[in-house]
């Protein structure tokens, strides 16, 4: 397995594997279910900024952050997208988007960030992930660092988190612009597919063993918004293993694999039992770029539109 492949799996699946004893993009993983929110004081640049992160913890800064360390690729994407890129002082070895993020000093990888390196940058805000990084939060806070956990369980939750990070970083207008684009994409998709019958859909996160997106994940939520009925939801929370026998029995109408698991749709025909799936016989097997559905950041809007185009291609293409 290549280093790139290991990194992708760590960032996408490792959080959830520990949480449900099987697997982690968002840099995924399922959170506590607490929606990120902000208090009225968050809007005031003159006083303390207080928001509630995806773990349910209140996060307060006396003033907007100027030195931000990101512990997950999705968090780095958020910072750059909302106009806080100049405030970034370090990120992980997996940060590859946008291009300028590659030049950031590294504090380690997603699964094993180096606490000493993080502290050496004297951050006034650390953007962490949930699950595997839960214990890390305690260590960082014991050293006096302020930590915001990015771990949304829904598409709307991802939008709320982006807005919260914007408040903490003092770039609310940039965050609002990103949030508006994500909301517009959601409304466009819902207008096209919202009244259509749900198409049974399976989304493959990993092929060996077969893994999918279950309940309590923003991917599951996005499949529903895009007009799909996620058969992976029956397997439980997070990113569980999924039985091939159950897959064949449920026979999804649409089969979507992330690009890190399958390179081209035709690959599925080489798997025992898969050639007889309705999705395969009807030509409804697709490969989707993993970073636009696995990272809970601004590009989820692109991922949502792509999912709708795969689940309901004719309706999604209509003007």
Predicted segments — roles?
Residues 94-97, 212-240:
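Alpha-helical, coiled-coil/dimerization segments enriched in small aliphatic residues
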Residues 112-131, 145, 243-257:
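Proline-aspartate-enriched helix->loop->beta-strand connector
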Residues 30, 58, 124, 135-208, ...:
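Extracytoplasmic substrate-binding proteins
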Residues 72, 92, 130, 205, ...:
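Short secondary-structure boundary segments
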Residues 54-56, 107-116, 153, 235-244:
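Short helix-initiation/N-cap motifs at beta->coil->alpha
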Residues 67-121, 125-130, 231:
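A short, structured surface patch at a secondary-structure boundary
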Residues 2-74, 173-202, 310-319:
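Bacterial Sec-exported substrate-binding components of ABC uptake systems
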Residues 133-142, 254-271:
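A ligand-binding cleft/hinge motif common to bilobed small-molecule-binding domains
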């Amino acid at each position: 397995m290549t280093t790139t492949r290991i990194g992708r799996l760590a960032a996408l699946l490792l959080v959830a594997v520990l949480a449900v004893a099987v697997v982690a993009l968002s840099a995924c993983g399922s959170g506590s279910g607490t929606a990120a929110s902000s208090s009225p004081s968050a809007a005031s640049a003159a006083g303390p900024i207080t928001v509630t992160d995806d773990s349910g913890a209140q996060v307060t800064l006396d003033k907007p952050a100027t030195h931000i360390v990101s512990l997950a690729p999705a968090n780095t994407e958020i910072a750059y997208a909302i106009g806080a890129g100049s405030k970034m002082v370090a990120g992980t070895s997996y940060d590859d988007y946008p291009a300028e993020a590659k030049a950031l000093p590294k504090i380690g990888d997603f699964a094993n960030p180096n606490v000493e390196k993080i502290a050496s940058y004297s951050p006034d805000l650390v953007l962490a992930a949930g699950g595997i990084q839960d214990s890390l939060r305690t260590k960082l806070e014991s050293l006096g660092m302020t930590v915001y956990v990015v771990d949304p369980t829904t598409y709307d939750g991802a939008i709320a988190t982006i807005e919260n990070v914007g408040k903490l970083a003092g770039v609310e207008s940039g965050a609002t612009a990103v949030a508006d684009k994500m909301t517009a994409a959601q409304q466009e998709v819902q207008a096209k597919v919202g009244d259509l019958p749900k198409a049974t859909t399976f989304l493959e996160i990993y092929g060996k063993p077969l893994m999918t997106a279950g309940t309590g994940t923003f991917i599951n939520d996005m499949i529903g918004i895009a007009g799909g009925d996620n058969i992976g939801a029956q397997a439980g929370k997070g990113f569980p293993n999924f039985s091939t026998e159950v897959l064949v029995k449920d026979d999804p109408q649409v089969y979507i694999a992330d690009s890190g698991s399958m390179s081209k749709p035709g690959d599925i025909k080489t798997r025992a039992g898969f050639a007889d799936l309705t999705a395969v016989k009807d030509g409804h097997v697709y490969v989707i770029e993993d970073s636009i559905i696995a990272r809970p950041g601004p590009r989820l809007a692109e991922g949502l539109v792509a999912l709708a185009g795969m689940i309901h291609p004719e309706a999604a293409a209509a003007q």
